[in-house]
Amino acid sequence: MGFPYNNGFTGTYKRKFNPASYKYAYVEDMNLSKDVWERVPNFFNLYKIHGSISWYKDEGDIFEKDYVDIDSDDTVMIYPTPLKDRTTLMVPYSDLFRNFESSLLKQNSVLVTLGYSFADDHINRLILNALAIPTFKLIVL
């Protein structure tokens, strides 16, 4: 689709997980003489709350692969196990949840879900809180 997005990783060669990037403002023009900068149109934050097969851990930090090796043992994901809820309290998931919740609670926020079964109570609680905000929109695909 060609929309610009932020997935929580920063850098060019070796993209490292940086939860602070969810707080960055992405603007069209870096002209410092302007009083008001215009945000990049159609920009969105992407939260992979359960991790991704394109993430790996190296010396305690989380990085993004530029290719996906499905047979790799170093992927960073939450698998559907009895330890799932405890895993969500660890890095990087705790940062993702905190930033995800903060984004949901902003006025005029929109959540687009793709392939989510709504079977995770900890995520559903965040969505239910957001649904109490009159300007919040939920789109389920």
Model-identified regions with their sequence ranges:
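Extended, H/D-rich, highly charged conserved domains that either
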Residues: 1-77
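Residue-identity detector for threonine
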Residues: 10-12, 75, 81, 87-88, ...
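N-terminal start-of-chain detector that recognizes signal peptides
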Residues: 16-22, 82-85, 110-113
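Generic structural signal for short, flexible, solvent-exposed coil/loop and linker residues
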Residues: 35-38, 42, 67-68, 82, ...
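Flexible internal linker/loop segments at domain or repeat junctions
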Residues: 60-98, 103
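SIR2/sirtuin-family catalytic core signature
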Residues: 86-88, 94-141
